[in-house]
Amino acid sequence: HGTIDYIDEPAETLEWQRRTGKTIGTQGSNYLMYESIGIFRTQDDLDSYPHLSDARVGDVKFRDVNGDKKIDGDDKVRMDKPAVPEIMYGINLGTTYKNWSLNMLWQGAARVWQYTFMEAGIIGNFTKDFYDNRWTEDNPNAKYPRTYNRDATVTGGGNYRNSFWLNNASYLRLKSIELAYNCPKSWFKGTPISGVR
């Protein structure tokens, strides 16, 4: 991927929100997001740090990028994390021993990110991992923020799209494997068969 050398942007566009200089074809060149810096674990935590007006304990905490002690649209940043893999690769490995052969094809993608939600289908249909590891008063050090209402949420995206839900989607998988045995030619003497594998 190349980078955007120039794009007609308003002069007042904040430096961290510009598309110029970002990688072509990535989320970083297309989307603005709040940068997650954790979860509001307690009321004191919420009261002592700038937050959106509807934020509650258990919500994702966003970075005050410009340091003005408030969280608003000026704090969104362009995330330089591509939705389309920047690196795709394959590895073909093979070995033989006597009449046996083993071949494997590995395939992978790297430097790719996916924006994921912990809710699917009807409202309130959360994944088990999210539900079991969400913030609650009894579990303030949870892995995930509190459960949320899809229509008014700080945690789940919507009007407050944020990097908490941006996950590395790089992978390496075994696409195919073949174990073969080459039957000795002596087995087929006197037949039109030249070999069987």
Predicted features and spans:
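Membrane-spanning beta-strand positions in outer-membrane beta-barrel proteins
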Residues: 101-105, 188, 197
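Extracytoplasmic gating/loop element in the C-terminal half of outer-membrane beta-barrel translocons
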Residues: 29, 54-57, 109-195
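Glycine- and acidic
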Residues: 75-77, 86, 90, 159-166
